Amino acid sequence: CYINNCPVG
């Protein structure tokens, strides 16, 4: 995940 985004789930 990133600071405010979790494209993997």
Curated annotation (Swiss-Prot):
Disulfide bonds join C1-C6. Its main location: secreted. It is found in: Secreted. GO terms for cellular component: extracellular region. Keywords: Amidation, Disulfide bond, Hormone, Secreted. The keyword Coiled coil does not apply. It comes from the Eukaryota. Belongs to the vasopressin/oxytocin family. Displays oxytocic activity on rat uterus. This is Asvatocin. It comes from Scyliorhinus canicula (Small-spotted catshark). The lineage of its organism: Eukaryota, Metazoa, Chordata, Craniata, Vertebrata.
